[in-house]
Amino acid sequence: MKREDINMSAQNLTLLTDLYELTMMQGYFETQENQTVVFDVFFRDNPNKGGYSVMAGLDQVIDYIKNLNFSYEDVDYLRGLGLFSEDFLHYLSGFHFSGDIYAIPEGSVIFPREPLLKVVAPIMEAQLVETAILTILNHQCLIATKASRVVYAAQGDGIMEFGLRRAQGPDAGLYGARAAVIGGCVGTSNVLAGEMFDVPIMGTHAHSWIMTFKDEYTAFKEYARLYPDACTLLVDTYDTLKSGVPNAIRVFTEMRDAGIKPKSYGIRLDSGDLAYLSKKARKMLDDAGFQDAVIAASNDLDEFLIHDLKMQGAAISSWGVGTNLITSKDCPSFGGVYKLAAIQNADGEFQPKIKISENIEKITNPGNKTIYRIYDKETGMLRADLICFADETFNTGEDLLLFDPNATWKKTLLPGGTYTMRELLVPIFQHGECKYESPSVKEIAEFCRQEKETLWDETKRLFNPHKVYVDLSQKLYDTKTKLLNEAHH
């Protein structure tokens, strides 16, 4: 089956928008205000007070933009609302996206206030796509970030995404699984996600399997007969240490005596004191000669519980994480926003626009912008991100002064030749045509792993992480200050 045949995002989701996007579109249409504008997608805070986030969802955004068109049924439905003129509905019937989109590639580490995605398009088009872009990026960035935190807590152990049945619907389960693999999960229990995104699928069996048979030993024996190369047995249906683990050892012994060498085998704990039970089970398995048997665990895990279990010396090397990962239960929203940044004038120049707020964190950065990531040349570690105007250039052979835009006295001078720079925003659509070839999910996940290696451990830690600075160029800072001053006079 072709990917596009099963990809839910390849459906026509044109009406996946808020009503006010359409009423504003009609307003622009009627007043003939359809100048080219720049909108930025950004977020203000990392989830869970973390040190970074992970970019995900761009591939679904691409599919959404490619399939933008108002069907006959869409137009007829809108006509029935009694809100829209026939001239405007006629315009919608021939609608297609003709603008440009730039974005940070999926798997990148990202930070608050920097543009993740930039839309440069006639305002009617740019306004329409706001809602869908936000719902896609807000969801997948959130889950990829959560997965990355869980993976970090596991200290190299494998994390399996097990959350489909607790996800907020099929779409969240599917694209949440995709995002989780991008964030570092080794696989998912979600079979359709495996088919759609070519990611590993994995799982064991439920308590119902054991309860169906006359006893636990028989259930284990039959499962091992059916799946000898991937035999992980759930040992807590009746009594973990008195029944489950001994019966698992009995089956593993019979397999060994029969000359069967599984590619992977072990037990799964799904309840009780996981630290205590895993250490006891580990000793029982080791004493029986099964030192290479894996102990997996599940049971409402998250990064904090896994961190705590690791601190207690739990003998667990594989973790199934469901509800708390697929829903990001303790931080259920990402907070991405879509703000106007510039309007093109009659001369083709972009005039910076700024949104002002009493809350300093809600004041936007004006203009048609891009981002440069700055690395230490010797170590390759990330030093800072620099937001600047899209037409600004830099010479890495020259000194670069970085400063905190909210506390300008905090400054860092990078001597010329000691740093490198990489532009983060890449062209995705040009004049309505997709110019970007999305990597596979496996490639994105590997890129994400490499990205996180450029972060200091102090930034990745779960508690009180070190902040990565996102600074403004002097030119952008001066423009922002000028606009703020003008607005208050």
Can you describe what each PLM-predicted range is?
Residues 1-229, 256-257, 263, 339-489:
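Ordered alpha/beta subdomains of enzyme catalytic regions
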Residues 208-388:
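Glycine-rich phosphate/ribose-binding loops and adjacent secondary-structure elements
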